[in-house]
Amino acid sequence: MFFDKQYIDSSLFILRQFLGKTFPNPPVVALLVEHDKNFKDHKIVSFGITGKSGRPHAEAVAIQNFKFNSRKKYTLYSTLEPCSHKGRGNSCTSEILKSKIHRVVFCLLDPDFRVRGKGLKILKQNGIEVFYGLMEKEAYKIYEGYFFNRIKRRPLVTVKFATSLDGKISKKKNNFSQITNKKSQKYLHIIRSMHDAVLVGSNTVRVDDCILTSRLEGLNHFSPIRVILNRKFDLPKNKKIFKDAKKYRTIIFTEKKNHKKISKKDFEVIEVEKKQFNLKFILEELAKIGVCNLLVEGGAKIFNSFLHSKYCDKIMIFRGNFFIGEQGLDALSSNNDIKKSNLEFNLIALNKFEQDHLEIFEKKRNSLILK
């Protein structure tokens, strides 16, 4: 239909605003459109968005909130294949079949093994006209972390750091330095709200005394899970990140031998066997709890560990408009120059926040990870 792209495009526009807001499920937007048999006089009569904790599903919300007219036809537009399995409620396919919807259009087959293709099959078997694959690439870019989680069994990883013009992250080692201006800092809170989890090393907590939440008005309830790599389990418990651990989910990765030190129950602990952190293990553990998009915020050792590995998918660099000098702490090791690694990363965006600049790099890929 001529208007399919229009409605799917509108759905994707809304979808972008809800990335990171529906953990542990991916966000979905559904639009219910009423029309006659020739698709004239078409209009949106209901819509649904995945609930904050992943339920209810968008399709169910759009259907349950509307009283159907038997003299009209209805098309349901969804950004992802309707689910076919029961969870905390009926499946979306069963809700569709109970309604007066005769046609369903969606962007992508759900990569979850419980769904993939089953929703499509059930709808077709019951006489529903189904069309999928519209604006597939645009939808995939939003759902990329979800596909990583379901297919690669790890989150999509974005490494984010702030540097001076000469590539320093602080004026000296073990010293906190404010690199960016207030506008850049506000944008960081938006970025955090779009991720399921944010990861830092123990030294970042020790030196910066960071909180790692989304503290802009309207985003307070969408803070990511805080993940700390603390091998020795030796962080002072008076740090800010521990004071609000009951309110904001906090996970600490530490050596197994430290279990006797662990008495505080406000945070979760994942034990590791080896002294050296294994990034593959960490990412797999985070994927198991539903993390699709992971933001890595520091510090220098963590940055370089991810950049040296095969697990860095995107890089965000905020650059303050000043120089620090040779005494400063380098963000990257000498063999980790991103601009020289042009075979691996593309510069995809360049934004400006007053005098600050934000560069966004993305790993080159041959194809979309759709299966």
Where are these regions (language model features)?
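Zn2+-dependent cytidine deaminase-like catalytic core
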Residues: 32-138, 307
